[in-house]
């Protein structure tokens, strides 16, 4: 029944002609059969693993390709968008003419083919969600977006009209990129007037997920709704926490907590009703995953989950420790693969705790500090972490990075707009902010997940607010001297060095980087006033 109706779906309005068949919102069973067909070759082919989930290889792109991201500069966007020539971001402008050329490459590639169409929602709040239609010729890409977007009911599909269309032409590249003045033959491009995203040359699934996040980041703050690169969960008493952080800092791991219900692991909005998830699934890193350390995520890897770039041995077992292909090995799964989730809709009330996760490769920042409102704005705009190996193409060593709002790669408006909306929402809810370092200290080792979980527990149950504190110089951060279940010797990062002078010189180096980065926000009075909330030399 479903398939017969689907054949009638008219795709000519998107420039797609001669389409031989359309599989609209196929079942997981159908997708499994399609993506494991023995005649598939190359990156189209999925392989079965002993855990029951299919594994795929995304080729040379094992992460997003920020250098190949473009947005059409036209009357809609020219004055509102945060362009790459105005700040550190990936919003490179292209003309409508270049867009037309790129789009015709994709429509030519997808025309005359058998296509998968997935209709889904981005956003759990019906008032503000985007209806997204994804069109691809690759079965596992359809599986990926079925996992990651919110799955409509049969009734919701009846009258589904897309607000945004994503056409994934991963098999096609742009031979004229030099003439167009672009970075390479690959492209991920957006047109906010047409409300279309097109993809060429990269097979990485995350481009579709993060593409729609970037669009929500444009549309929601203009309505006064916070749009956030964060995970979120809720306790038994309805107490909501959000966890901001860049890739690899612990958003998914730390918000997946047996004692709390998961709202979502990566993208959320905050409106008058509270926190809501944008997504219908999770996209967890699997490098060095173990059943003991992360049972919820490990147990989510079963039939209907989709693994990316992991090493599958000849006996179908998975070597999660092998990062030879990439450190950015991942799994996508529908959110209900985690038992402990908010049901039936991934949303909850207002957040009381806002946690900024950072993975400090320098070994300077404390494992936890409570932030003042001014420090909250300062650290939100700074968005410091260390880029971890392989989450983007071309990065293999931990290197310091500053990413406004802990997600500059996905921001489409000026960072101060996100800071303003967030702080307004926090003040209205009486929320408090903390910075948590999940990175390294003077021992040269990463802070243990057990200690970090103990810190998070202390924040969530309020015991951190009763703890005695002391001040960490240079960064002027208040840190607890002891917390239940946490190794007290790590709470002051200076104590982890055999020679405390080492910390001093590293702290000075990192402070200078913070100051240099924050200079970009001092072009107005509010930005100038926030300098005092940052490190002082």
Curated annotation (Swiss-Prot):
One of its GO terms (molecular function) is ATP binding. Mn(2+) binds at residues 210, 229, 266. The keyword Metal-binding applies. It comes from the Bacteria. ATP binds at residues 210, 229, 245-253, 294, 330, 446-447, 452. Binds 1 Mn(2+) ion per subunit. One of its GO terms (biological process) is gluconeogenesis. Its cofactor is Mn(2+). Pathway: Carbohydrate biosynthesis; gluconeogenesis. Keywords: ATP-binding, Cytoplasm, Decarboxylase, Gluconeogenesis, Lyase, Manganese, Metal-binding, Nucleotide-binding. Its EC number is 4.1.1.49. GO terms for cellular component: cytosol. Its main location: cytoplasm. Substrate binds at residues 64, 204, 210, 330. Involved in the gluconeogenesis. Catalyzes the conversion of oxaloacetate (OAA) to phosphoenolpyruvate (PEP) through direct phosphoryl transfer between the nucleoside triphosphate and OAA. This is Phosphoenolpyruvate carboxykinase (ATP). It comes from Aliivibrio fischeri (strain ATCC 700601 / ES114).
């Amino acid at each position: 029944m479903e398939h017969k109706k689907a054949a009638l779906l008219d795709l000519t309005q998107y420039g797609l002609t001669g389409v031989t068949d359309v599989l609209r919102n196929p079942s997981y069973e159908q997708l499994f059969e399609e993506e494991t067909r023995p005649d598939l070759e190359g990156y189209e082919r999925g392989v079965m693993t002993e855990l029951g989930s299919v594994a795929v290889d995304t080729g040379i792109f094992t992460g997003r390709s920020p250098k190949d991201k473009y947005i059409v500069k036209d009357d809609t966007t020219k004055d509102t968008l945060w362009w790459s020539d105005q700040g550190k971001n990936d919003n490179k402008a292209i003309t409508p003419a270049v867009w037309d050329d790129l789009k015709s490459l994709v429509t030519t590639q997808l025309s005359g083919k058998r296509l998968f169409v997935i209709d889904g929602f981005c956003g759990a709040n019906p008032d503000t969600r985007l209806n997204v239609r994804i069109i691809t010729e690759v079965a596992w890409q359809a599986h990926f977006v079925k996992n990651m977007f919110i799955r409509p009911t049969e009734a919701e599909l009846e009258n589904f009209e897309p607000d945004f269309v994503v056409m994934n032409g991963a098999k096609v590249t742009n031979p004229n990129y030099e003439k167009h003045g672009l970075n390479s033959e690959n492209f991920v491009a957006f047109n906010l007037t047409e409300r279309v995203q097109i993809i060429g040359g990269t097979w990485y699934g995350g481009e579709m997920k993060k593409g729609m996040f970037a669009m929500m980041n444009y549309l929601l703050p203009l309505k006064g709704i916070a749009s956030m690169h964060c995970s979120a969960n809720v306790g038994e008493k309805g107490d909501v926490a959000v966890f901001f952080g860049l890739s690899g800092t612990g958003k998914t791991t730390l918000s997946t907590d047996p004692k709390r219900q998961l709202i979502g692991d990566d993208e959320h909005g905050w409106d008058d009703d509270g926190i809501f998830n944008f997504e219908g699934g999770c996209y967890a890193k699997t490098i060095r995953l173990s059943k003991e350390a992360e049972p919820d995520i490990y147990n989510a890897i079963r039939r209907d989950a989709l693994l990316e770039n992991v090493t599958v041995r000849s006996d179908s077992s998975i070597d999660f420790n092998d990062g030879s292909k990439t450190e950015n090995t991942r799994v996508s799964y529908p959110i209900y693969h985690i038992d402990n989730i908010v049901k039936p809709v991934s949303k909850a009330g207002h957040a009381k705790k806002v946690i900024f996760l950072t993975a400090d490769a320098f070994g300077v920042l404390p494992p936890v500090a409570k932030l003042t409102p001014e420090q909250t704005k300062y650290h939100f705009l700074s968005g410091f972490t260390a880029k971890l190996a392989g989450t983007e193409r071309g990065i293999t060593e931990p290197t310091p990075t500053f990413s406004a709002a802990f997600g500059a790669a996905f921001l489409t408006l000026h960072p101060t707009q996100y800071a303003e909306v967030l702080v307004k929402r926090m003040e209205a809810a009486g929320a408090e902010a903390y910075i948590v370092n999940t990175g390294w200290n003077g021992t040269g080792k990463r802070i243990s997940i057990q200690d970090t979980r103990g810190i998070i527990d202390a924040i969530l149950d309020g015991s951190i607010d009763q703890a005695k504190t002391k001040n960490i110089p240079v960064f002027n951060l208040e840190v607890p001297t002891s917390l239940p279940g946490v190794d007290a010797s790590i709470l002051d990062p200076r104590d982890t060095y055999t020679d405390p002078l080492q910390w001093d010189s590293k702290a000075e180096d990192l402070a200078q980087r913070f100051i240099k980065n924050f200079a970009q926000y001092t072009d107005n009075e509010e930005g100038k006033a926030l300098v005092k909330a940052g490190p002082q030399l």
